[in-house]
A protein has these predicted regions:
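Hydrophobic, small-residue-rich alpha-helical packing segments that form membrane-like cores
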Residues: 236-266
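Extracellular polysaccharide-degrading/modifying enzymes targeting complex plant/algal/animal polysaccharides
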Residues: 1-216, 221, 228, 234-236
């Protein structure tokens, strides 16, 4: 990546204090919920937060704390300490916010885990609490991300949140490109107990959270709208009655498209 990396001082563009990166997942101790997240887009396509390996996963070698944790006969550990293989993680020892993404116990329960420290002698990751809900097992697939030292492929990027500097390895010529960063960390529409309100023909994009939230209320209409390039769910309707979603396009969202719930569950 030498000579191909570009950097941007976000303060020059009015982007000030940056919140810590917080990611969850189904198995996360932080809860299965949308955590607003910044994303970088190049000509409308999401870029990759710098990671290793560049594709696929590596496996946990062992879980050193044998605390007797067992689920359905599968042995693991509730303690966030993981043995890794090889020398690569030694490069990350001074990185400020290393994350590991993996399926730590079951192949359907994912989470992002923050690394508190790396013991290069023991080849051990020490994770921050709260730990993954189901715990951890040897052989679990994972990859590391949010690593400045691992920008080595076109499309990878990293944000130094303390300095406000964004680093990017562009996948093509920047001169004619649209490079966009999603910075809004709340829904574009939050309608709580709102009734008889319509939204027509609007485009909501480049948000880090859910796009539109309607909670309670009645007879709200969202028609012919577009929700795209966001970090959470596109449109959330929770409770209320007689709401209508009509002819909307929802795509390129980080979590899901439409999430509709309600009714009498008794």
């Amino acid at each position: 990546a030498r000579g191909k990396l570009v950097q941007v001082d976000l303060a020059r563009y009015g982007i000030g204090e940056l919140k810590p990166l917080r990611l969850g997942g189904y198995n996360s101790g932080l809860g299965f919920t949308t955590h607003p997240v910044m994303e970088l887009f190049f000509n409308g396509e999401p870029m990759t937060l710098a990671r290793w390996p560049n594709e696929g996963f590596v496996q946990v070698v062992d879980v050193p704390v044998k605390d007797g944790h067992t689920i359905h006969g599968l042995e693991g550990s509730k303690t966030g300490r993981l043995i890794y293989e090889g020398e690569r993680p030694a490069r990350w020892k001074d990185e400020p916010a290393v994350l590991l993404y993996g399926y730590w116990f079951f192949g359907w329960a994912d989470s992002y885990e923050r690394v508190a420290s790396i013991d290069t002698e023991k080849r051990e990751f020490v994770l921050e609490e709260p730990y993954a809900g189901y715990g951890y097992r040897a052989g679990a697939p994972y990859y590391a991300l949010n690593l400045l030292s691992e920008i080595d492929m076109p499309g990878e990027w990293y944000l130094d949140r303390a300095a406000g500097i964004l680093y990017f390895y562009p996948p093509a010529d920047l001169s004619e490109a649209a490079v966009e960063l999603s910075v809004i960390d709340f829904p574009f529409v939050q309608a709580d107990n709102v009734s008889h309100t319509s939204f027509r023909g609007l485009v909501w994009e480049l948000g880090g959270a859910n796009g539109v939230e309607i909670r309670g209320g009645s007879q709200c209409l969202i028609a012919g709208c577009t929700v795209r390039r966001g970090g959470g769910d596109g449109i959330v309707v929770a409770g209320g009655n007689s709401h209508t979603l009509l002819g909307c396009d929802v795509y390129s969202m980080g979590r899901g498209g439409l999430l509709v719930s309600g009714g009498d569950r008794k």
